[in-house]
Every structure is written in structure tokens, then in C-alpha cells.
A protein has these predicted regions:
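Hydrophobic beta-strand scaffold positions of dinucleotide-using enzymes
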Residues: 53-55
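Rhodanese-like catalytic fold shared by cysteine-dependent sulfurtransferases
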Residues: 2-8, 18-38, 44, 51, ...
Length: 133
């Protein structure tokens, strides 16, 4: 009887550990992006050095005004361009669009592609800081 109890306990522990591993994503990598505020994104831009800003809008929207140093990778091109233009999958990547919808889609796609440090901060319509044209 003690052996059966011991086996059941070991089985439950094993299943629990397996479940935790499955939830953490492939190889323990992040399985989601972090949503932050515009203020938090600005703080990162002011204090960090090693980050990339992705504008997930269209070329026309980008030309109307964008956050300084942002690179344009429209949300619908992330799959095709990320590997080439974003070779470091652990790089801090900040993502925005116009309202937040496309930046969420782009951030989800980046995570699916294996990027582990993605932060989405919504849309430029809520960006209270300077932009460049």
C-alpha cells in the first residue's frame, strides 16, 4: 500500500512539473509579450541603450510622423522581415502602431518567432511625447 501511495505521489509531482514546463513556452522562453504604458516605454528609451523600436503601421502612416529612431516593419510584414532585420532574439523590442491593435498582433507574431523580450506600448495616438516627420 505504501508503494502505491508513493507511486501516486511521484506521478502527481511529475505531472505538475510537466504542466509548469509546458506553460513556460518552448525551452523555457517567454510565451507572451509584456504590455507597458507609453510612459514606461519613454523611460526605457531615456535610460536604456540596447533596444529597438518597431513601428507596426503602414509606410504612409510612418511618413506622417513616428517616434524617433523607430524602424518601420508593418504588422503584416513581421513574419517575412523579422529574422533578417532583428537577428538577436533576446534584444529588447518596443512595439507600437496607431491605436494598439496592430502592435499587439506584431508582438504576438514576434513571440511566436522566438523573440523573448518584446514590450508592446499601444498606439501613437496615445503617445504624449515628441515625434519626428
Amino acid at each position: 500500500m505504501k508503494k502505491v501511495k508513493g507511486l501516486i505521489i511521484m506521478l502527481l509531482i511529475s505531472l505538475s512539473l510537466f504542466g509548469m514546463t509546458a506553460c513556460s513556452g518552448e525551452n523555457g522562453k517567454a510565451s507572451t509579450y509584456e504590455q507597458i504604458t507609453a510612459e514606461q516605454a519613454k523611460t526605457i528609451m531615456d535610460t536604456e541603450k540596447d533596444y529597438i523600436i518597431i513601428d507596426a503601421r503602414t509606410k504612409e502612416e510612418f511618413a506622417e510622423g513616428h517616434i524617433e529612431n523607430a524602424i518601420l516593419i508593418p504588422e503584416y510584414e513581421i513574419k517575412d522581415r523579422a529574422e533578417k532585420e532583428l537577428p538577436d532574439k533576446e534584444q529588447l523590442i518596443l512595439v507600437y502602431c496607431r491605436s494598439g491593435r496592430r502592435s499587439k498582433i506584431a508582438s504576438e507574431e514576434l513571440v511566436k518567432l522566438g523573440y523573448t523580450n518584446v514590450k508592446e506600448f499601444g498606439g501613437i495616438i496615445d503617445w504624449p511625447y515628441d515625434i519626428v516627420k
